[in-house]
Amino acid sequence: MVQPHDHKSASPQDTVTSVSIQLLLFVDDRPSSQENIEQIQEHLERLKSEYPYDLQVIEIQQQPHLVEYFRLVATPALVKIVPEPRQTLAGSNIVDQLNKWWPRWQCAIKEAQDAQKVHNETNNQGDGDSPLNSVGYSAELIRLSDELFRLKKEKEELAEQIKFKDQVLAMLAHDLRSPLTAASIAVETLELANNQPDSPRIVQLKEQLYQQTRKQFRIMNRLITDILQASKSINAQLQLQHTHLYLQPLCLEILKQMGDQFQEKSLKIEKDIPQDLPPVYADEELIRQVIVNLLDNAIKYTPEEGTITVSILHRTTQKVQVSICDTGPGIPEEKQDRIFEGHFRLKRDEGKEGYGLGLSLCRKIIRAHYGQIWVDSTINQGSCFHFTLPVFR
């Protein structure tokens, strides 16, 4: 990697003793850039004999805030910060551009030196250090400005998180009340039924009450799970544990585990999952979470005796596509993009448990795997959710 020239240390505390041409050379670590960078530095070294200057070489990986501040779009790039106005040279012909602009910069710096001399004589000052003209000082000022902007942004994000959590707690308290009340009534009725002599009617009533109680507890569990998942996605970046993952056994395992939920609504499950699928490069637990969430939604919106289809396609050598389809009410076309937003709910969801936070988390997980997730849906015909994952190589 190219190191800073001896003309100027990279320390922000360094200052220069007079007004001089001051340059920032932005470089990267690409091998293809090294020859161009060396040519620029060699040419600057030759120019030094004509006129002194101060140069700081900046590696963009170490100081990205400077890249953003100077709005650089390519490297290498040479930025002249003194004399003003600031000027950026970029592209493959920086040496030619230097030859064009160097005489003009010399004239401008001589004018600045004359003005500085008059100012010093007027104010009875010597040629002391001029930190305002220091490359290091300018870089430090930019860094502090960038840090202030970052802290303001973090403050705004934290305020949004606190606001969201307050909203979620209020929603949770409100939505938990209904299933909790229903479960309490069912338990109290069971207590009364246990004091009655057994009869076919009492046995049937108990079974119905048990089912009702289990259903209400599942609703409460779903509400709490939604909140926990959303909290994780907001408070921390996803920690992916990539491995070569075989989707066929994972999908079959999940379908088996959710069998009781399918049977409860007499749903028909259709599978099109080839055995010769290549492994994907993914985090098993996070992908399991995505599949379970999409199947949960399919169960919730598919009417009794409806059909849910799970299929996996390997259309290219680079990715695998998973699709989960239902025969539910469908999603309006104008709403299909918004359902992946964290707090968006369709009108059909107003009577459903959950907050619709699951699809937002699914999108975050799939994007973290460099995949895509989307929905195809037709009103009154059903919806198909698709996502892709990269093939393991």
Curated annotation (Swiss-Prot):
Catalytic activity from the UniProt record? ATP + protein L-histidine = ADP + protein N-phospho-L-histidine
CDD domains xref list: HATPase, HisKA, KaiB_like
Cite the EC number.
2.7.13.3
Alphabetized PROSITE patterns for the sequence: HIS_KIN
Give GO MF terms, alphabetically: ATP binding; phosphorelay sensor kinase activity
Q: Listed disulfide bonds for this chain?
A: none
- Which residue positions does the secretion signal occupy? none
Note the superkingdom of the native organism: Bacteria
- Annotated InterPro entries: HATPase_C_sf, His_kinase_dom, HisK_dim/P_dom, HisK_dim/P_sf, KaiB_domain, Kinase_SasA, Sensor_HK_Regulatory, Sig_transdc_His_kin-like_C
The cross-references to SUPFAM superfamilies, in alphabetical order and at most eight, read:
ATPase domain of HSP90 chaperone/DNA topoisomerase II/histidine kinase, Homodimeric domain of signal transducing histidine kinase, Thioredoxin-like
Residue span(s) of domain Histidine kinase: 171-393
UniProt keyword terms in alphabetical order: ATP-binding, Biological rhythms, Kinase, Nucleotide-binding, Phosphoprotein, Transferase, Two-component regulatory system
Q: Name one GO biological process term.
A: circadian rhythm
Which enzyme class, named as a word?
transferase
List-wise, which residues carry Phosphohistidine?
174
What biological function has been recorded for the protein in this entry? Answer: Member of the two-component regulatory system SasA/RpaA involved in genome-wide circadian gene expression. One of several clock output pathways. Participates in the Kai clock protein complex, the main circadian regulator in cyanobacteria, via its interaction with KaiC. KaiC enhances the autophosphorylation activity of SasA, which then transfers its phosphate group to RpaA to activate it. In addition to its output function, recruits fold-shifted KaiB (KaiB(fs)) to KaiC to cooperatively form the KaiB(6):KaiC(6) complex (independent of SasA kinase activity).
**UniProt remark on domains:** The N-terminus interacts with KaiC, while the C-terminal histidine kinase domain autophosphorylates and is probably responsible for self-oligomerization. The N-terminal domain stimulates the C-terminus to autophosphorylate.
Q: Which HAMAP family match?
A: Kinase_SasA
Q: How does it assemble?
A: Homooligomerizes. Interacts with KaiC. Participates in the KaiABC clock complex, whose core is composed of a KaiC homohexamer, 6 KaiB and up to 6 KaiA dimers. SasA and KaiB(fs) compete to bind to KaiC.
Please report the name of this protein according to its UniProt entry: Adaptive-response sensory kinase SasA
Organism in which the protein naturally occurs: Gloeothece citriformis (strain PCC 7424)
